[in-house]
């Protein structure tokens, strides 16, 4: 027994070292992309935030030499002058409200349409459902610039829709250069990804569960809300978060289809940076958008955590 004890101890040590070596090997394999992200994304973000706090020296000196209306600090931590200026600006508050409203409304419409298409495909499976799914995915292959311009030309005051109404002697609606036009274009551009995510989640629900619910007397509505949607909850949350993050920071769609004022913060950031030569205020807006997107991303992180927990269980 005493002779075998050292060998058992050595074996146990080897078993402990193997997971450690594997984790270290995995960390080394993942380090190159992490370093690239830190160098080309994380470091510029740190510089931009420092500039927004009034640190205009170092690598921010070139931008500070040509920028206007800057808030410069002598304190080590910076100054909140730029944040105070932007957050108290009535125009920024109005555009922030428009951005949040467009994001919430567009994301809600996208989710409703995506779930309708996904459920129709799952519960019927006919050629009409497959055709509807294919048509819903078509905008995925159309560039956002072309899609935005097409929506504008369709709903513009001199666009296709009003021309058709004019042929019948009617006054057609005008959605071009309006917030409603921005919502329509956002839904058009965001729907394909949401359809793919929701359809994959709904299709993954086992037929046995649906049949069991029907055998128990559950109707279509009860089966949908009690079985299908809870089982596909994680893909639905992922679709909602990606859609919301994509809309809240968008530039092309509101730039082409929206009004000059009020507009979304993506357009405001570009205007302040290029047209007004006020990059410090533009970065403050970017920080606000980043904070809002981070709040949306919390739902995505929670959904992934829940999915991993359920898979581990």
Regions found by a protein language model. Name each.
Residues 128-131, 177-180, 195, 209, ...:
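Residue-level recognition of membrane-helix boundary sites in multi-pass small-molecule transporters
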Residues 23, 179-181, 205-238:
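Amphipathic cytosolic juxtamembrane alpha-helices at the membrane-cytosol interface
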Residues 1-31, 124-130, 299-313:
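Transmembrane alpha-helical segments of polytopic membrane transport and secretion proteins
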Residues 68-85, 179, 260-274:
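Short hydrophobic, aromatic-rich alpha-helical segments embedded in or entering the lipid bilayer
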Residues 153, 251-279, 313:
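Glycine-rich helix-loop "coupling/hinge" segments at transmembrane-helix boundaries
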Residues 2-5, 10, 199-210, 214, ...:
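C-terminal transmembrane helix and the adjacent membrane-cytosol boundary/short C-terminal tail
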Residues 25-67, 90-171, 182-203, 231, ...:
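Membrane-water interface segments at the C-terminal ends of transmembrane alpha-helices
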């Amino acid at each position: 027994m005493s002779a075998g004890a050292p060998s058992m101890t050595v074996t146990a040590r080897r078993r402990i070292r193997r997971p450690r070596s594997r984790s270290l090997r995995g960390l080394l394999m993942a380090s190159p992309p992490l370093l690239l992200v830190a160098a080309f994304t994380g470091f510029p973000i740190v510089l931009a935030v420092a500039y927004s706090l009034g640190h205009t020296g170092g690598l921010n000196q070139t931008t500070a030499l040509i920028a206007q209306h800057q808030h410069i600090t002598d304190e080590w931590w910076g100054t909140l002058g730029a944040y105070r200026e932007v957050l108290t600006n009535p125009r920024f508050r109005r555009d922030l409200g428009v951005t949040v409203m467009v994001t919430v409304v567009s994301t809600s419409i996208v989710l409703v349409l995506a779930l309708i298409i996904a459920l129709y495909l799952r519960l019927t499976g006919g050629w009409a459902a497959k055709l509807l799914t294919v048509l819903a995915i078509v905008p995925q292959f159309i560039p956002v610039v072309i899609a935005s311009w097409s929506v504008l030309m369709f709903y513009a005051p001199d666009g296709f829709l009003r021309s058709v109404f004019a042929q019948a002697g009617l006054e057609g609606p005008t959605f071009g250069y309006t917030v409603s036009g921005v919502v329509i274009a956002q839904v058009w551009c965001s729907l394909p990804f949401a359809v793919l995510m929701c359809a994959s989640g709904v299709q993954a629900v086992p037929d046995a569960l649906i049949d069991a619910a029907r055998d128990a007397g559950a109707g279509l509505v009860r089966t949908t809300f009690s079985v299908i949607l809870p089982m596909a909850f994680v893909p639905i949350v992922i679709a909602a978060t990606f859609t919301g993050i994509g809309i809240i920071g968008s530039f092309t769609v509101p730039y082409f289809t929206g009004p000059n004022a009020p507009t979304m913060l993506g357009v405001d950031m570009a205007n302040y940076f290029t047209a007004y030569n006020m990059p410090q205020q533009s970065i403050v807006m970017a920080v606000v958008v980043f904070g809002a997107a981070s709040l949306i991303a919390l739902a995505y992180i929670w959904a992934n955590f829940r999915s991993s927990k359920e898979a581990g269980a």
